[in-house]
Structures are given as structure tokens and as C-alpha cells.
């Protein structure tokens, strides 16, 4: 018996604040395949010359994306974003881990959001 989709799309979110690692686990649905739009965001503020920030996104234990960049916009914030889509077969969870680094920059916010479409 096939289970109907919920009346509202699933939304999952983790806000790690100024933490350096965020983990979002979307639990499995035993009956249906789901599709998610996923956004990962790091916000930093430069503390001095040579400031840099980096973000690595791992999905189910494998590298999905990584980037390092100079931190710009002195006196304000700078950010790094990664957006991707993932099909989640019935019975399978999805684990997203975002790891960050900051040199001469302060982490302000680390966020992962997933919305079913």
C-alpha cells in the first residue's frame, strides 16, 4: 500500500549559531521517495588582514562540495552558500554535515535547511 504525501511539504533545519560544525539528519520515510532542496550557509565577519573562511559539505559520509575564500566586506559580514538537490528513496535517511574553518574571521552563523518539493 502506497502512503500519500503529507498535506504540507517536509521542512528540516539546524541552526548551529557560531559553531564550526552543523549536522542535519532527515529521517527515512518507509513508504515514499522524497525530493529535497538543500541550502547550507556560513556567515562570517572579518577580524583582520588576511581573513579567510571555508566550508565543506558531506552527504551520507561522502564529500559533496568544498570551498575556501578570502573574507571581504570589512565592518559587515561575508557569507558562503551552497545549494543542492537530493532524491531520497523510501526507507533511506539523509545525513548532511557542514564543517567550517575561519582564520582572522569570526563565525556568526552556520545553517542547514532542507525543504521537500
At which residue positions do the language-model features occur?
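Terminal beta-strand-rich extracellular "head" domains
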Residues: 43-83
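Short beta-strand segments enriched in hydrophobic/aromatic residues
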Residues: 42-44, 98-100, 114
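A short beta-turn/strand-edge loop motif at beta-sheet boundaries
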Residues: 31-34, 46-51, 104
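Transition segment at domain starts
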Residues: 1-23
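Short beta-strands within extracellular/lumenal beta-sheet-rich domains
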Residues: 15-30, 76-84
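Noncatalytic modules at the cell exterior or secretory-pathway interfaces
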Residues: 33-38, 85-109
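Short beta-strand-to-coil "C-cap" segments at the C-terminal boundary of structured domains/repeats
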Residues: 111-117
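Short edge beta-strand/loop segments characteristic of extracellular beta-sandwich folds
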Residues: 27, 39-45
